[in-house]
Amino acid sequence: SQVTGRASEDVVLFVGTGATSAVAKLVSALGLAGPLPPGWKPNDRPVIFVGPFEHHSNLLPWRESCGEVVTIGENSSGGLDLAELEEQLRRFASRKLKIGSFCAASNVTGGLEDVDRVTATLHRAGALALWDYATAAPYVHV
C-alpha cells in the first residue's frame, strides 16, 4: 500500500523479465498451470476475463492454464465494454475463482483503461483484478 497508495490487500509483482514472466508466475502461484487437475469438473475451472487489445504476454499464460478464457469486447469509445463484463460476471457467478486480467493501457490503440471502475466491477462480483502496466507505467502514476 505504501507503493501504490491502494489497500493493503493489493499486491504488485515486480518481475525483472517482463509481463509474460509475471503473468506466468502468477498462473503458477495460483495453481492454474497446465491442464485441469484430476477430479475437477469443467465448472470447477476458473474463468479469466481479458480485454480486446491484450498483448500476448497477458493472453498466452492464461490460454495455457486450466482456466477458461473469455474475451470482453470494446465499447463505442474504444475501452473495455463494462456492460459486457458485468453480463459475463453474472454468467459465470457460480465459478469459485474469477479473474479479470487486463492491460491498463493498450499497446495497440494507446487508450487508457478506467482501472478503478473496472476493478470495482470485478470486486463486486468477487473476482480478482489483475493489471498489466507495462505500456501504461511511463505515462500514469502507479
Language-model regions, residue ranges each:
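Pyridoxal 5′-phosphate
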Residues: 1-142
